[in-house]
A protein has these predicted regions:
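Type III/flagellar secretion export determinants
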Residues: 1-125
Length: 125
């Protein structure tokens, strides 16, 4: 669905930003992805780099989605609509809907939504 694609793009752009790479500075998605890969590689080889990347993953809410920064970068470069990121976002969206239906209240979604706002990660439409 559209909103998943939008969430995915948002997540990719925010992941880039977390790596110090701004989407607007690149004329094409592939240039942007290449810059993300480069930044990721540079952080990874630094001492404490892996820890820093895990911290970014938590900050971006990727851990809750069961994704790594590498997954996001791969998904950005892939353009395949059925990649790991899309599947994770679909699961999360479905889970939020199921929880709402199950409890008959929006409480579960509200908690998720508060966390999401914290990360600015997902928009529940």
């Amino acid at each position: 669905s559209d909103s998943i694609a939008k969430q995915k793009l948002d997540l990719i752009v925010r992941t880039g930003r977390a790596l110090g790479v701004e989407r607007n500075n690149y004329s094409s998605m592939s240039d942007f992805v290449a810059a993300m890969k480069k930044a990721f590689g540079e952080i990874k080889v630094q001492s404490g780099g892996t820890g820093a990347l895990h911290a970014l993953e938590r900050q971006l809410g990727l851990d809750k989605l069961g994704l790594s920064i590498e997954d996001v970068i791969e998904s950005a470069g892939d353009g395949d609509s059925n990649d790991k990121v899309t599947q994770a976002l679909e699961r999360q969206t479905k889970k939020a809907k199921d929880e709402t239906n199950a409890t008959g209240s929006d409480q579960a979604v509200e908690i998720d939504s508060a966390a999401a706002n914290l990360y600015g990660l997902l928009s529940f439409n």
